[in-house]
Amino acid sequence: MITYLFPGQGSQKQGMGSSLFDEFKDLTEQADETLGYSMKRLCLENPYSNLHKTQFTQPALYVVNVLSYLKKIQDNDIKPDYVAGHSLGEYNALFAAGAFDFITGLQLVRKRGELMSMATDGKMAAVMGLTAAQVSDALQTHGLHTIDIANMNSPHQVVISGRKEDIERAKSVFEGLKDVTMFHPLNVSGAFHSRYMSEAKQEFEKFLQSFHFSAISIPVISNVHARPYEQDGIHSVLADQIDHSVRWNDSIRYLLDKGRMEFEEVGPGHVLTGLIHRIKNETEASPAM
């Protein structure tokens, strides 16, 4: 069996999609018309460093991931048995599964990016070396009750999310714990996947009400539940995803439990491929996890 994985925010880089925009000219022009700016110029020239601003990053990654997927299908004609995406990448997984067409997905991620970009007083950081339970215990022990766990990327890679000043306080706490191998602040504009996204979630819920989703043809593993989407739950899960944790480790463990599974990352970079290796290695090293 094979699972296609689609990366999310953080995988963007100048030059991504360079070989795809001319090959898929019609879709690129549709994206430009929908967004009101040139996707090719954004990705190749990165004017005003817009590629790293959430409201531009999310549409750009969605488009490049879609074109990468279409190129892959065009070249090898192999449909995956499962699809999954990390945060924003989940929209590409749903596109691949037929839940919506290219432009519908683009309209969704444009709105999502706009809403998330408005929450600018937060920060995120990756904690390496501790499990999610250990991170949660440390937050409680040191009175950091205003910080949430945003991503559970692997057994020992956890991302926390909160107000800027609280993440700064957490830095000294985690760097003082002997099992922490790294505390790495992320270059993001807000406290994504946390309680601080509740307003964005509420607005996105309203926006989603005008959309109808088609039948899913490939199982899509949800970040929120680490299980396949149910057809009647797409609206609620997409809204919940904004302020809920990304259960990436659990999602990959679920897929690994299906038997012999190959994973292929579709889109720019190799972040998810690296996480797959970490999940496999750390799970083998810690069977009780």
UniProtKB/Swiss-Prot annotation:
Pathway: Antibiotic biosynthesis; bacillaene biosynthesis
A single GO molecular function term of this UniProt record: [acyl-carrier-protein] S-malonyltransferase activity
Main localization, broad class: cytoplasm
GO cellular component: cytosol
SMART domains, A to Z: PKS_AT
Keywords: Acyltransferase, Antibiotic biosynthesis, Cytoplasm, Transferase
Localization in the cell: Cytoplasm
List of catalytic residues: S87, H193
GO biological process: antibiotic biosynthetic process; fatty acid biosynthetic process
Enzyme class: transferase
SUPFAM superfamilies assigned: FabD/lysophospholipase-like, Probable ACP-binding domain of malonyl-CoA ACP transacylase
Name used for this protein in its record: Polyketide biosynthesis malonyl CoA-acyl carrier protein transacylase BaeC
